[in-house]
A protein has these predicted regions:
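Concave beta-strand-loop units of leucine-rich repeat
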Residues: 1-8, 15-50, 54-76, 80-93, ...
Length: 176
């Protein structure tokens, strides 16, 4: 198998539906066209400016971005986004505005320990919400209130609210 020096070679894959990236050095996506791309999984922070890839995706998975604090740059151009999975983002303290994503109906959060502001949920179009190991400093009541404030919520799963399960009983009471 030959080593590819540039990501431009991907432009030949017009039907490429799913792309998973974990690059060791930033690259330029300016000359890459992937009209069939719908699923994008980004791991790590050396993927370059992936804005050109975001316009057609419907599923975005962001993972292990240790220094990333603001997710707006990933979400604002992703106007067709339907499902979002945020995983192991230790610097994220608040969710960005979700009201500009009218097709976003499912959000899964995992290991966002510093998350302390979930107010964006109340202005979202979400129907499904799942979270595990988030908002270590949020009380059980604050977490439950944020979930209950999602206007069109049909299903929610809060598993392992924290590693010690100290908030689990409080969340159960709040939902009762």
């Amino acid at each position: 198998m030959e080593k590819c020096e540039g990501v431009e070679v991907l432009s030949g894959l017009k039907q490429l539906h799913t792309l998973s990236l974990w690059l060791s050095a930033p690259v330029s996506w300016d000359n890459v066209s992937l009209p069939g791309l719908r699923v994008l999984h980004l791991r790590g922070e050396k993927n370059g400016d992936i804005t050109p890839l975001l316009t057609s995706i419907t599923y975005l998975h962001l993972e292990e971005m240790r220094k990333t604090e603001d997710l707006a740059a990933f979400l604002t151009p992703a106007t067709r986004l339907q499902k979002l999975y945020l995983q192991s983002l230790p610097a994220v303290q608040e969710l960005p505005a979700l009201d500009g994503l009218p097709s976003l109906y499912a959000l899964k959060l995992y290991e966002l320990h510093k998350l302390n502001d979930l107010s964006a949920l109340s202005h979202s179009h979400l129907r499904c919400f799942a979270a595990s190991l988030i908002g270590d400093k949020l009380s059980a009541q604050a977490l439950a209130d944020a979930v209950m404030a999602i206007p069109n919520l049909e299903a929610a799963a809060l598993q392992l609210a924290d590693r010690s399960e100290r908030r689990y009983g409080g969340i159960q009471k709040a939902f009762a």
